Amino acid sequence: MAEAYPGGAHAALASRRSSFRNSLRRLRPTEKPDTSFMRGVWKYEIFPSYVRVTNKQVLQLDAQCQELPPCPSVGQILSFKLPSFSFNTTTYGSRYFTVAFLFFGAEDNEVFLKPFFVMHSAPGHRAKRPESAQPVHREREVYLVHCAHQIGQEPLPLPADSARAERHSADTLLHPERGQAKHQRAPDLPQWLSRHQPGRVPALPAGAAHAPISKVIRPYSHIPGEGMSGQRHTPR
Protein backbone atom coordinates (compact mmCIF):
# COMPACT_ATOMS: atom_id res chain seq x y z
CA MET A 1 0.00 0.00 0.00
CA ALA A 2 2.86 2.38 0.77
CA GLU A 3 4.19 2.13 -2.81
CA ALA A 4 0.89 3.43 -4.21
CA TYR A 5 1.15 6.73 -2.32
CA PRO A 6 3.97 9.28 -2.58
CA GLY A 7 5.59 9.73 0.79
CA GLY A 8 5.28 6.17 2.05
CA ALA A 9 3.06 4.52 4.65
CA HIS A 10 2.51 7.68 6.68
CA ALA A 11 0.96 9.50 3.71
CA ALA A 12 -1.13 6.44 2.89
CA LEU A 13 -2.50 6.25 6.43
CA ALA A 14 -3.29 9.97 6.44
CA SER A 15 -5.10 9.61 3.13
CA ARG A 16 -7.24 6.76 4.47
CA ARG A 17 -8.11 8.78 7.59
CA SER A 18 -9.11 11.74 5.43
CA SER A 19 -11.32 9.54 3.24
CA PHE A 20 -12.99 8.06 6.33
CA ARG A 21 -13.73 11.54 7.73
CA ASN A 22 -15.20 12.63 4.41
CA SER A 23 -17.45 9.57 4.30
CA LEU A 24 -18.75 10.38 7.80
CA ARG A 25 -19.50 13.95 6.72
CA ARG A 26 -21.56 12.69 3.79
CA LEU A 27 -23.63 10.53 6.15
CA ARG A 28 -24.26 13.43 8.55
CA PRO A 29 -27.70 15.01 8.06
CA THR A 30 -27.73 18.56 6.75
CA GLU A 31 -28.41 21.12 9.45
CA LYS A 32 -31.14 23.59 8.58
CA PRO A 33 -31.04 27.19 9.82
CA ASP A 34 -33.61 28.49 12.27
CA THR A 35 -33.84 31.74 10.33
CA SER A 36 -32.42 33.03 7.05
CA PHE A 37 -32.66 36.42 5.35
CA MET A 38 -30.91 38.49 2.71
CA ARG A 39 -29.06 41.78 3.14
CA GLY A 40 -27.88 43.04 -0.24
CA VAL A 41 -25.79 40.29 -1.84
CA TRP A 42 -25.25 38.52 1.50
CA LYS A 43 -27.35 35.66 2.83
CA TYR A 44 -27.55 35.36 6.63
CA GLU A 45 -28.38 31.93 8.10
CA ILE A 46 -28.91 31.67 11.86
CA PHE A 47 -28.23 28.14 13.13
CA PRO A 48 -28.65 26.91 16.73
CA SER A 49 -24.90 27.12 17.38
CA TYR A 50 -23.58 29.67 14.87
CA VAL A 51 -24.52 32.15 12.18
CA ARG A 52 -23.31 31.81 8.61
CA VAL A 53 -23.06 34.69 6.17
CA THR A 54 -22.47 33.73 2.54
CA ASN A 55 -21.83 35.68 -0.63
CA LYS A 56 -21.85 33.42 -3.68
CA GLN A 57 -19.94 35.94 -5.73
CA VAL A 58 -16.19 35.47 -6.11
CA LEU A 59 -14.79 38.47 -4.27
CA GLN A 60 -11.43 40.11 -3.89
CA LEU A 61 -11.46 40.64 -0.12
CA ASP A 62 -9.54 43.77 0.75
CA ALA A 63 -10.02 46.91 2.83
CA GLN A 64 -11.65 48.74 -0.12
CA CYS A 65 -14.22 46.01 -0.84
CA GLN A 66 -17.76 47.40 -0.61
CA GLU A 67 -19.50 44.01 -0.61
CA LEU A 68 -18.46 42.94 2.87
CA PRO A 69 -20.88 42.45 5.77
CA PRO A 70 -21.38 45.41 8.14
CA CYS A 71 -17.78 46.25 8.99
CA PRO A 72 -15.44 49.09 7.94
CA SER A 73 -12.71 46.87 6.47
CA VAL A 74 -11.39 43.33 6.26
CA GLY A 75 -8.73 44.04 8.87
CA GLN A 76 -11.38 45.17 11.34
CA ILE A 77 -13.69 42.20 10.82
CA LEU A 78 -11.58 40.15 13.20
CA SER A 79 -12.23 42.41 16.18
CA PHE A 80 -15.64 43.81 15.29
CA LYS A 81 -18.52 42.85 17.59
CA LEU A 82 -22.27 43.19 17.32
CA PRO A 83 -24.30 44.26 20.36
CA SER A 84 -24.98 41.73 23.06
CA PHE A 85 -28.46 40.31 22.57
CA SER A 86 -30.72 37.57 23.92
CA PHE A 87 -31.83 34.79 21.57
CA ASN A 88 -35.36 33.43 21.43
CA THR A 89 -36.07 31.90 24.85
CA THR A 90 -37.68 28.77 23.39
CA THR A 91 -34.50 27.98 21.46
CA TYR A 92 -31.64 29.35 23.51
CA GLY A 93 -33.01 30.30 26.91
CA SER A 94 -32.28 33.71 28.38
CA ARG A 95 -28.50 33.57 27.92
CA TYR A 96 -26.65 36.59 26.58
CA PHE A 97 -24.16 36.27 23.76
CA THR A 98 -21.48 38.30 22.10
CA VAL A 99 -20.45 37.67 18.52
CA ALA A 100 -17.37 38.36 16.40
CA PHE A 101 -16.85 38.30 12.65
CA LEU A 102 -14.44 35.93 10.97
CA PHE A 103 -13.93 35.40 7.26
CA PHE A 104 -11.82 32.82 5.48
CA GLY A 105 -11.70 31.46 1.96
CA ALA A 106 -9.42 30.45 -0.90
CA GLU A 107 -10.32 29.89 -4.52
CA ASP A 108 -7.70 27.33 -5.50
CA ASN A 109 -7.79 24.98 -2.51
CA GLU A 110 -10.96 23.44 -1.10
CA VAL A 111 -9.41 22.72 2.30
CA PHE A 112 -8.81 26.43 2.86
CA LEU A 113 -12.53 27.15 2.51
CA LYS A 114 -13.13 25.57 5.90
CA PRO A 115 -13.70 28.28 8.49
CA PHE A 116 -11.28 29.08 11.28
CA PHE A 117 -12.88 30.37 14.44
CA VAL A 118 -11.58 33.20 16.61
CA MET A 119 -13.17 33.78 20.00
CA HIS A 120 -12.63 37.35 21.20
CA SER A 121 -15.39 37.46 23.81
CA ALA A 122 -14.27 34.53 25.99
CA PRO A 123 -10.47 34.15 26.22
CA GLY A 124 -10.63 30.77 28.00
CA HIS A 125 -13.16 29.27 25.61
CA ARG A 126 -12.02 27.18 22.65
CA ALA A 127 -14.27 27.69 19.65
CA LYS A 128 -14.89 24.73 17.36
CA ARG A 129 -15.90 24.59 13.74
CA PRO A 130 -19.49 23.38 13.37
CA GLU A 131 -19.38 19.80 12.15
CA SER A 132 -22.16 20.51 9.66
CA ALA A 133 -20.36 23.43 8.03
CA GLN A 134 -19.20 22.10 4.68
CA PRO A 135 -16.81 23.96 2.38
CA VAL A 136 -18.30 25.00 -0.96
CA HIS A 137 -15.99 25.69 -3.89
CA ARG A 138 -15.79 29.31 -5.14
CA GLU A 139 -17.95 30.70 -2.36
CA ARG A 140 -16.89 33.25 0.21
CA GLU A 141 -18.24 32.64 3.68
CA VAL A 142 -18.21 34.84 6.74
CA TYR A 143 -18.94 33.26 10.09
CA LEU A 144 -20.29 34.91 13.19
CA VAL A 145 -19.10 33.04 16.26
CA HIS A 146 -21.01 33.44 19.51
CA CYS A 147 -20.45 32.26 23.05
CA ALA A 148 -21.90 32.84 26.50
CA HIS A 149 -21.24 36.36 27.73
CA GLN A 150 -18.85 36.46 30.69
CA ILE A 151 -20.14 38.85 33.34
CA GLY A 152 -17.57 41.42 34.40
CA GLN A 153 -15.45 40.97 31.28
CA GLU A 154 -14.06 44.08 29.59
CA PRO A 155 -16.21 44.66 26.48
CA LEU A 156 -14.73 44.87 23.00
CA PRO A 157 -14.91 48.11 20.97
CA LEU A 158 -18.38 48.69 19.53
CA PRO A 159 -19.88 51.01 16.94
CA ALA A 160 -21.02 54.24 18.56
CA ASP A 161 -24.76 53.65 18.15
CA SER A 162 -24.69 50.14 19.60
CA ALA A 163 -22.28 50.71 22.50
CA ARG A 164 -25.10 52.15 24.61
CA ALA A 165 -27.23 49.02 24.16
CA GLU A 166 -24.28 46.79 25.04
CA ARG A 167 -23.46 48.72 28.20
CA HIS A 168 -27.11 48.74 29.25
CA SER A 169 -27.43 44.97 28.76
CA ALA A 170 -24.27 44.26 30.73
CA ASP A 171 -25.29 46.72 33.46
CA THR A 172 -28.69 45.10 34.01
CA LEU A 173 -27.01 41.71 34.32
CA LEU A 174 -24.40 42.93 36.79
CA HIS A 175 -26.76 45.19 38.78
CA PRO A 176 -30.36 44.02 38.47
CA GLU A 177 -31.30 46.13 41.50
CA ARG A 178 -30.82 49.28 39.42
CA GLY A 179 -34.22 48.74 37.84
CA GLN A 180 -35.92 47.21 34.80
CA ALA A 181 -35.78 43.56 33.86
CA LYS A 182 -32.78 41.43 34.68
CA HIS A 183 -32.63 40.14 31.11
CA GLN A 184 -33.04 43.35 29.14
CA ARG A 185 -33.26 42.58 25.43
CA ALA A 186 -30.79 44.45 23.26
CA PRO A 187 -31.30 44.96 19.49
CA ASP A 188 -31.64 41.64 17.70
CA LEU A 189 -29.47 40.63 14.76
CA PRO A 190 -31.85 41.25 11.81
CA GLN A 191 -32.89 44.69 13.09
CA TRP A 192 -29.29 45.75 13.69
CA LEU A 193 -28.18 44.55 10.26
CA SER A 194 -31.06 46.34 8.55
CA ARG A 195 -29.70 49.65 9.86
CA HIS A 196 -26.12 48.95 8.72
CA GLN A 197 -25.95 47.87 5.11
CA PRO A 198 -22.60 46.83 3.54
CA GLY A 199 -20.54 49.86 2.61
CA ARG A 200 -22.58 52.19 4.89
CA VAL A 201 -21.38 51.41 8.38
CA PRO A 202 -20.29 53.46 11.39
CA ALA A 203 -16.60 53.71 12.15
CA LEU A 204 -15.23 51.96 15.21
CA PRO A 205 -14.02 54.08 18.13
CA ALA A 206 -10.66 55.78 17.67
CA GLY A 207 -7.76 53.80 19.05
CA ALA A 208 -9.56 50.46 18.86
CA ALA A 209 -7.07 47.63 18.52
CA HIS A 210 -7.46 45.43 15.46
CA ALA A 211 -5.48 42.20 15.34
CA PRO A 212 -3.61 41.66 12.06
CA ILE A 213 -5.07 38.90 9.94
CA SER A 214 -1.77 37.00 9.94
CA LYS A 215 -1.82 36.94 13.74
CA VAL A 216 -5.39 35.69 14.04
CA ILE A 217 -5.99 33.17 11.25
CA ARG A 218 -4.04 30.04 12.01
CA PRO A 219 -2.34 28.08 9.22
CA TYR A 220 -4.11 25.00 7.91
CA SER A 221 -1.41 22.72 9.30
CA HIS A 222 -2.15 23.86 12.89
CA ILE A 223 -5.73 22.58 12.95
CA PRO A 224 -6.03 19.25 14.79
CA GLY A 225 -7.73 16.44 12.94
CA GLU A 226 -7.59 18.05 9.51
CA GLY A 227 -4.97 15.87 7.83
CA MET A 228 -1.21 16.08 7.46
CA SER A 229 0.72 19.30 7.89
CA GLY A 230 1.26 20.98 4.56
CA GLN A 231 -0.87 18.52 2.63
CA ARG A 232 -2.82 20.18 -0.20
CA HIS A 233 -6.12 19.07 -1.67
CA THR A 234 -7.51 20.43 -4.92
CA PRO A 235 -11.27 20.75 -5.46
CA ARG A 236 -12.93 17.89 -7.23
Swiss-Prot record:
Keyword Lipid metabolism recorded: no
Keyword hit for Secreted: no
GO molecular function, one term: identical protein binding
InterPro entries attached to this UniProt entry: Herpes_Orf11
GO biological process, one term: symbiont-mediated suppression of host innate immune response
Family: Belongs to the epstein-barr virus LF2 family.
Name of the protein: Protein LF2
Gene label: LF2
